[in-house]
Amino acid sequence: DSVRDNGEDYILTRQAIVDYIELYLRTPADFHDSRFAPLIATSLADLPRTLVITAEYDPLRDEGEAFAARLDAEGNEVACFRMNDGVHGYFLYPSVLSLVRDTYRLIAHFLDGDPLPKPGDRPWLTLLGTD
């Protein structure tokens, strides 16, 4: 569980997540609104081509990857990449410039309309040429 494993000492903490949720919610009923939590939507079918990028040490990693898996299961065109050694918001930190550069290259491939990898492919190596 990424919240348990990465919810302390990696910039975004478990408590900060709770605090942000409380700031975002208008009423407790929002917890049951798929606009607040897309994973609870009855259907995620027929959504646009989607790129999901998660970070290895992000407490929200599992949620992002579950969203990508659900999009895939419902027939959407989706690719999901976990950025090794990344923390929540890593692309804002110049100390991880090579990781940021790779992330932007991945986004550029997606925006250019390059084909998304199929399950079982090695998309990191294919798209970024880092073999």
Q: Predicted segments — roles?
A:
Residues 1-131:
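Alpha/beta-hydrolase superfamily serine-hydrolase fold, recognizing
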